Amino acid sequence: MRFRYFFWAGALLPLAPALAQTSAPAAAGLGMPPARPAPPPQVLRMTVAPDGSGDYRTIQEAVNASRDLSQVTVTILIKPGTYREKLVVPAHKTHVTLVGEDARTTIITGADHTGDAAGHNTYSSQTVLVQATDFTAENLTFENAAGPVGQAVALHVDGDRATFRRCRMLGNQDTLFPAVEGSRQYYQDCYIEGTTDFIFGTATAVFDRCEIRSKRNSYIAAAATTERQAYGFVFRDCRLTADTAAHKVFLGRPWRPHARTVYLRCELGAHILPAGWDNWRDAANERTATYAEYKSTGPGAAPAARVPWSHQLSAQEAKRYTLARIFGGTTTWQPLE
């Protein structure tokens, strides 16, 4: 034991000065972590231009370049042009904001549709798919240019806390798909057009000061609200207009039995049928769907002629339709009105 003790002691003595001069990487091997390199700077603003004058030529390239799971807003400025893309904002690309210069000159377009050669269906035909939370779009057009060929979605939104301002959604059947339960979506000063069920889905969505334009005789809203949801589609201070080909249009019909759709202070054109609502060929839906109006105006406003299973809200009932209440959920969210 004495031999071993002096052996180790002798070995340690000459090593002491060396230890004092050990570099950081060597020290890490002794339990001291090396200093981490500084993270690369986070790019919070990018520009897309089809002529190559921006950071990227396509919107998808810019989205792909944004930081994953960002906790701050990443703004992508989009120059005027027609962008022929099947754009996806995946779930890990959070807090992305797309800003165009003018919705009429900044257009994202596609033409996929149910039954096309690629085998698309309603759930894959969209031109733009938003899966990420905290997404915002301003001054953009989302278009499905397939024409009247069946289901052809322009914009499909799954993510929570999605906001669209001064945007246009162009298409025919199934133009706008606020898709899933638990998703809260806000549309302000937007233009939305279509033919059959052109605003449809399960999400909770509010439409403020939007123009809702029917292109032919059919149905506007096809909510699929679940019985767990207190709110479905809420239209506030909107204008319901129509092409000359549309003169018999329903406010909505229930895609699922517990559909909820409410119009508050909306101006209804003459194309809206006096009955107002359709039961989708199932009388049982009349007992479960919630369809209501408050202070509708215009030639399409006919409260006395509405189907008996719909409702005309009182002033007190209408007060419940605030953004704070509608978007309450498990986490608070109140977009700027």
PLM regions and their residue ranges:
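Bacterial N-terminal signal peptides that target proteins for export
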Residues: 1-8
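Bacterial N-terminal signal peptides
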Residues: 8-18
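Sequence-level preference for short, compositionally simple segments enriched
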Residues: 21-337
